[in-house]
Amino acid sequence: MDKTPRRLTLSVDGASRGNPGPAAIGVVIKDEKGATTLKVSSSIGRATNNQAEYTALITALREARKLGADHVDIRTDSQLMAEQILGHYKVRNANIKPLFEEVKQSLAGFKSYGMHHIPRERNSEADALANDALDTLNNS
């Protein structure tokens, strides 16, 4: 059996209309060759933008684990979330702390991870998935 370490790239985005308000997530998981392995576009109920961002990441990490990832490379346009996970910013919001702890616990299950803050225009695929879920919610 081939036990080559599996490295996946996780692009995540959360969106909220109202902040807090109706919220949704977008996740794109790609393999080592850049091929899309999984996409998630889902509403998550009422949440803030930051709660939605964290929920997107939790979902992506859970799916990456199911796909057998050993290493994950995370891309997000949320500077706050990226800096909190890297330990550069403190988590002060009581609603974010349990989500942050869940992310940290999940990350500990991987051999390694990278966290990258990227411009929104470079996260357009995950952003579109989150907004598509919100649009579907608003039109139903």
Regions found by a protein language model. Name each.
Residues 1-3, 97, 140:
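N-terminal intrinsically disordered, compositionally biased regulatory/targeting segments
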Residues 2-51, 62-66, 70:
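RNase H-like nuclease fold core
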Residues 43-51, 55, 91-94, 98:
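Residues at secondary-structure transition points
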